[in-house]
Amino acid sequence: NLQDHTIRFIVDDCIKFVKREQRRGRKYDGIVMDPPSYGRGPNGELWKLEEELFPLIQECMKILSDDALFFIVNCYTTGFSCSTLNEALSRSIQKEKGGHIECGENLLPVTTNDSVLPCGIFGRWTND
């Protein structure tokens, strides 16, 4: 039932975007993020998911509306576990807003046999 809702897809430096939205006083009912494992900004800024994800989630919480419905994180970082993502979401969003957290593996089915290939993890907070 999202046909009557405004949905924006943003490709931008995530921290700069979130801080800009904070200054503008904007609020969102849901956030879907797919942060990179590693990256460098134009001025040599270093981004490492394992160091920056928790602060990013905390900043995003400031732009979640009081009636937020969901917050989804997709990760492809090798060695970043479901339990780590679950802990980050629990200590931030769930601690402040309650709700439910689900974390798991992203799996790709292999069409030539009856198996799957793991290709990352996801975390989802919902306000239920």
Model-derived features with residue positions:
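Glycine/threonine-rich flexible loop motifs
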Residues: 41-49
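C-terminal catalytic and target-recognition region of SAM-dependent MTase-like enzymes
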Residues: 68-128
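A short glycine-rich, Lys/Arg-flanked "PGG" loop and its adjoining helix->strand segment in the class I
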Residues: 50-66
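Glycine-rich, phosphate-binding/catalytic loops in enzymes
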Residues: 48-51, 89-90
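Active-site-proximal loop/turn and secondary-structure-junction residues that shape catalytic pockets
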Residues: 13-15, 37, 77
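Conserved proline-anchored active-site loop of SAM-dependent methyltransferases
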Residues: 28-42
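S-adenosyl-L-methionine
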Residues: 1-32
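Conserved protein kinase catalytic core
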Residues: 19, 40, 80
